[in-house]
């Protein structure tokens, strides 16, 4: 196949054998968010470039090196969204849904785009589920977001594989004081910093704390600590969050180097990390951004949220073998029909069954075929049971019912009793 007809590097097709697990994960998260009172919002995947420069920060790696930006026919600079928070804030501002102090608890799902080096768990098109809450400024809502994700990990069976890391960045004023102290400390040791950290020191000093370079990490051991520069408001907020997590029985560790890669965060920041996926260990991250709405032209409005990477969490489910058996099976019952009259009856019969069992995954054989070939298809489909409809069954208005997995003899079931029988065997099963 020529290169022009291949997917773009780092942008992957999600094939039919993969989508059931994606749908299971997405459905589990959506149900949980609904139960917690969050409402879905859908934003465009393309925004004006200025939105991300104003929100994420012009000197961040995302804006400087990773965004997919282009000029449209009107001469406007547009960007494929690299993250969801800025677009969500733009939407609530544009439509005025947080005006007058209205509390909004929102969630979204969709693709994001960053021009990074593709590797396992990191792609140029990736998918996120995000939550954003506006006009609640206490630590209780920060705690709720974390408790919600903790419950999700439990439902997915991955709770033992993830760890919660917490930090507080303080207010913008506290962070500015700390930034000055950090720059002074590191500038005196510039020759000991790696090249990337030297660049970050000039553009976004707090990101030096993110470094993976062992020499720079050694320098940071004696660096000023952000916690020593927190204002009283931020200290009280952070202590309130920790108290709520302690009360809920959620374990966490304080990571003083956790700063996040986006400029808009303040006070609470958190990450859920795992050591099961190699270098790409962050599966969910978020925090508070109380100044972002005002920064983007709105009135002072508190905000807090998180985003989780679907690719990484699906990969974690597969790695830990936490894929429910029914998810990998896409068919419950396979109906084999032999002869033209049986094929006609099969379609009508299957629709009657679907009327009574709307959640039954029933597949009818298509393309005719011999008894042997149809049973081979039935087995390959992963179905639990095969239904057999031929001339003899048609004459008696019955179907053959044959278990395909495990023990059980074939038996005849009257058409009128078929739905009830399937409900017992499959739906209640």
Curated annotation (Swiss-Prot):
<comment type="similarity">
    <text>Belongs to the class-II aminoacyl-tRNA synthetase family.</text>
</comment>
<keyword id="KW-0648">Protein biosynthesis</keyword>
<dbReference type="GO" id="GO:0005524">
    <property type="term" value="F:ATP binding"/>
</dbReference>
<dbReference type="GO" id="GO:0004821">
    <property type="term" value="F:histidine-tRNA ligase activity"/>
</dbReference>
<dbReference type="Pfam" id="PF13393">
    <property type="entry name" value="tRNA-synt_His"/>
</dbReference>
<keyword id="KW-0030">Aminoacyl-tRNA synthetase</keyword>
<dbReference type="Pfam" id="PF03129">
    <property type="entry name" value="HGTP_anticodon"/>
</dbReference>
<keyword id="KW-0067">ATP-binding</keyword>
<keyword id="KW-0436">Ligase</keyword>
<protein>
    <recommendedName>
        <fullName>Histidine--tRNA ligase</fullName>
        <ecNumber>6.1.1.21</ecNumber>
    </recommendedName>
</protein>
<keyword id="KW-0547">Nucleotide-binding</keyword>
<dbReference type="InterPro" id="IPR033656">
    <property type="entry name" value="HisRS_anticodon"/>
</dbReference>
<dbReference type="InterPro" id="IPR041715">
    <property type="entry name" value="HisRS-like_core"/>
</dbReference>
<dbReference type="InterPro" id="IPR015807">
    <property type="entry name" value="His-tRNA-ligase"/>
</dbReference>
<dbReference type="InterPro" id="IPR004516">
    <property type="entry name" value="HisRS/HisZ"/>
</dbReference>
<dbReference type="GO" id="GO:0006427">
    <property type="term" value="P:histidyl-tRNA aminoacylation"/>
</dbReference>
<keyword id="KW-0963">Cytoplasm</keyword>
<dbReference type="GO" id="GO:0005737">
    <property type="term" value="C:cytoplasm"/>
</dbReference>
<dbReference type="InterPro" id="IPR006195">
    <property type="entry name" value="aa-tRNA-synth_II"/>
</dbReference>
<dbReference type="InterPro" id="IPR004154">
    <property type="entry name" value="Anticodon-bd"/>
</dbReference>
<comment type="subunit">
    <text>Homodimer.</text>
</comment>
<dbReference type="InterPro" id="IPR036621">
    <property type="entry name" value="Anticodon-bd_dom_sf"/>
</dbReference>
<dbReference type="InterPro" id="IPR045864">
    <property type="entry name" value="aa-tRNA-synth_II/BPL/LPL"/>
</dbReference>
